[in-house]
Amino acid sequence: MKVILNEDVKYLGEEGDIKNVAKGYARNYLFPRNLAVPCNEFTLAHFESRKEEIEAKKAAKRQDAAGLKEKLEALSIKILMPAGPNGKLYGAVTTQTLFDELQKLNFDIERKRIEILGQTVKSTGVHKAIVKLYENTSAEISFTVEAQIAEEKPVKASEKKGRRPRRDEEASDEQILAEENSVTEEAVSEEIQNSESEN
C-alpha cells in the first residue's frame, strides 16, 4: 500500500516521501508510531501545503552533508594491523574497521553508508573508501594501513627449557668429575697401604 512519511524513517525514506510498503508494516509499525499516513487525496493535499517547509529541511540536510564531506576528506586515518614482512595482512580491513575508526573520531555515520573500493583491504599502504552522505553527496576518504609489529619479550633464565650447557659449563662439570675421581683414587691407595702395613 502507498503511504506518505510524516518524518524521516531509517532505511525507508524522508519526510514527505511517498512509499509503497507492505500492509502489515504500515498498520503494525508506521501508523501506530505516527511515522506515516495512508496516501490519499486528503493527505496529498496536506503535504502539498507543506512542500516549501519540507524542501527547506532538505536544503539544510544538503548543506550539512557538504560540510561533513569536507571534514571527512580532510581526515588522516591510520590503521594498525598485524602483517607479514611482505605487507600482506593476517586479517583484513573491512567497513566495520573503518566504522570503528570514524566512531573514535566522533563521526556518527551508519556502517552501511561506508563502501571500501575493492570490498576489503588485505595489504598495507594507502587505500580509499566512499562514504555516502545525503542524496548524491559522497565523501572519498583515504586511510593508511600500517603493519603492527609485536614486541618480543625477553626470555627469562627460568623459562629456558631444554637448553644445552655452554662449553664453559661443560668444562666445569668435567673438572668436578676429574677431581672426584682423584679423591676416590687417593682414598683407595691409602686403604691398600694401611692393609699392607698391618700384615
From Swiss-Prot:
Gene Ontology CC: ribonucleoprotein complex; ribosome
Q: Which GO terms describe its molecular function?
A: rRNA binding; structural constituent of ribosome
Superkingdom assignment: Bacteria
In this chain, the stretch annotated as Disordered covers 153-199
Q: Does the keyword Transport apply?
A: no
Claim: RNA-binding is one of the keywords in the record: yes
Q: Which PROSITE patterns match?
A: RIBOSOMAL_L9 (PS00651)
GO terms classed as biological process:
translation
> What Pfam families does the entry give?
Ribosomal_L9_C (PF03948), Ribosomal_L9_N (PF01281)
Q: Give the family from UniProt.
A: Belongs to the bacterial ribosomal protein bL9 family.
According to UniProt, the name of this protein is Large ribosomal subunit protein bL9
From which source organism is this entry?
A: Treponema denticola (strain ATCC 35405 / DSM 14222 / CIP 103919 / JCM 8153 / KCTC 15104)
Q: What taxonomic ancestry is recorded? A: Bacteria, Pseudomonadati, Spirochaetota, Spirochaetia, Spirochaetales
Gene name, per UniProt, is rplI
